[in-house]
Amino acid sequence: MSERKEKREALFPEITRRGLLKAGSALVTLPFVMSGKAMAAKTAAGTAQASAESAERVVQTCSTFDCGGKCDIRAHVADGVVTQITTRPDSALDPQMPVMRACVRGRSYRKFVYHPDRLKYPMKRVGKRGEGKFERISWEEATTLIADNLQRITAKYGPACRFVHNNTATSGGTFSGDKMMRRLLNLTGGYLEYYHSVSMGNTAAATPYTYGTAASGNSLDTLADTKLVILWGHNPTETIFGHTNHYFQQMKQNGTRFIVVDPRYSDTVASLADEWIPLLPATDNALMDAMMYVIVSENLHDKAFIERYTLGFDEASMPEGVPANESLVAYLMGDKDGQVKTPEWAEKITRVPAQTIRQLARDYANTKPAALIQGWGPQRHNCGERTARGSTLLATLTGNVGIKGGWAAGYGGCGNRKFAAGPEMPDNPVKESISIMNWVQAADDASKVTAEAGLKGADKLNSNIRILFSLAGNYLANQNPDLHQAVKVLEDESKIEFIVASDLYMTPSARYADLLLPETSFMERWNIGETWGTASYLILSEKLIEPEFERRSDYDWQREVAAKLGIEPQFSEGRTEQEWIEHIWEQTRLSMPDEQLSTFAELREKRQHLFKSKPYVAFEDNIRDPQNHPFPTPSGKIEIFSKRLYDMNNPEIPALSHYVPAHEGPEDALAKQFPLQLITWKGKNRANSTQYANPWLQEVQVQKLWINPMDAQQRGIRQGDSVRIHNQRGVCQVPAEVTQRIMPGVVAMQAGAWWQPDADGVDHGGCANVLSSARITPLAKGNSHQTMLVEVAKYESAV
């Protein structure tokens, strides 16, 4: 055994860490691994560790996996091994870069990187797709297989048969394998592109119909004077999105009141909320409608703001060519449908008491400034576009748009965000594109992918997807909704002829590859990390250690493929991975002269760059000077009523964003057979499905089904019982967590668990996507992962 391997294995003794990891939120401040000195006292290899301490270097870096925090990770490296992970000390915290301390995910990366189950060699499939049977091959054979199949299949079907899938595990860096794969394909004829973000695509598509742009969020430092924050389906305490928690905790200490609207009593409710308001999933618009009714009927709306800046509030402010009784006031008062949108009406739909609705509406309207901040979970329903726009109407009625301390709601992306340049991308000769939600259809039968279904740039697709690259992405057979339908297409080798996957582990999706390649971790490659949401800094993610076994970065093997296709000089431009990062940094520096970015050599010393952004309020100029800064809508105003949506003439896309019962929502006839609504949440121990394979993090939060005591009692379910969750699409079996932290009528599981089917197709991993729907949303052509009806039963083993 090599000295380096011996040292690495000594760092992971077979002891339980459950007692440490159960500390929950305290993990943010605890070290997760023993120090080198502590290990030296327990292991023989620790002697070598102690003697090498003088040669140890501590490098500031960040993960470029699928996490938006980009926290400060301090990697302790000695003799080519990461021996410890710490984080930025309190004494080094900067007011402009607050809470750069690594969370539980960041502190556990060492186990993830050095886990013995990581893929080690390139392999090709020898069994049926999905069986997980592979044999080891050389890199020469692997890159030849890719080059030969690209040439053969492209010659037969054309370049539009090639598809690079959603690759979440690498999306946190500016230089990733999926980006460079697209570059390679564009140099050889192009590929079928996709649009839509599974994370927030519905709200990003809907918000511009109110404001003309999706960038409706303020920088968080403008919220210091906010008196009331309503977090609507927003759970930053667990998702850890940049600096959000830091600012919210400061506001809490300074007296800001927090209300959380969520079916689940999340950690955000526990840590921030003065009040928790649970409501049935997919009924958000009914609650919003009733709030608007109270605000208007009690004369609490901001009349001057509405008169000056909006279109569609009442009949007098409607656009031309629209019949009577289509305005917001007419809808709320029931002038057209005969139903007044009272809190009593909404209570029957949402299960929120009428008096709670009244008080919530009054509090929001009477408190200035106030911020209604919607998370991205509610917009992942098939009614999510309406929910996103509904929040913008509430912000508009109360005049909380374009002011410091307010929030325009909707998508919430900050309009002054800055990004690194990224690698240059040649033009894609293939002009058609599909929604990411159409990929199964495009692989199964391209004729079904019509403009109505989301096809752009062409009247039809000329080919099914025949070549698919899944590079560090676990979407194919895990994160994809209606998983069994997707797997059925993947298993049919007459459909997709060649699937290439690269990953760190044998994920459920990797099992369906024809060629499986061992990927490098962020510690074994060069990159630049950038935060999501706040986007206040860039941080260098430097290669710290050499890859073990035969692991290679995507870019490394892509250069070999490019050489075999005769395009290596155009593809690489003669640059190594590190040289690409230097080039990207220089391009970023030139594109932002006002930022005065350091040279790359200086960056290697400083490690990060803090943007010099000033406090930013979305639509501040539009409100201050509407004459010279009209809203970028057709009317130049905030469009409460959207004539563009009205002209689509689709009842599922109302011109006024209001409540329409959701497919598979609580009012659907299917609820008689499947009476419980299932939702998922993003947990603190992984980002989507990334790091699921880390055993330390599995102990942080065991995969269970949350069920309310009332629903459990009706089904004879007790704490810890094995239960089966089922609907018309699949069956999932996990232990029950009987808790009042979930409202009656709703059950919940953490998202991102790996699919683990048995011989009968029953999932034992807790992957909710065996139950979720692939129905696309009507406007964005996006995902509706969260809209699920299920039934739950105690499982009695026959043994």
Please report, for each region that a protein language model flagged, where it lies by residue.
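Extended redox/cofactor-interaction regions of prokaryotic respiratory oxidoreductases
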Residues: S2-K7, G177-V261, N285-A286, K348, ...
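N-terminal export/assembly segments and adjacent metallocofactor-ligating motifs
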Residues: S2-L300, L471, A759-V799
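Glycine-rich phosphate/diphosphate-binding loops that line cofactor/substrate pockets in enzymes
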Residues: T143-R162, S219-L228, G338, R358-A371, ...
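Long, well-ordered, tryptophan-enriched scaffold segments
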Residues: S266-T367
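Short beta-alpha connecting loops at secondary-structure transitions
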Residues: A273-L279, Y537-P547
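Active-site phosphate/pyrophosphate-binding segments
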Residues: A324-A443
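Phosphate/diphosphate-binding loops
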Residues: E497-F498, K543-A562
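Long, contiguous, secondary-structure-rich segments that constitute the structural scaffold
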Residues: D554-L603, T690-Q691, P695-W706, M710-V799
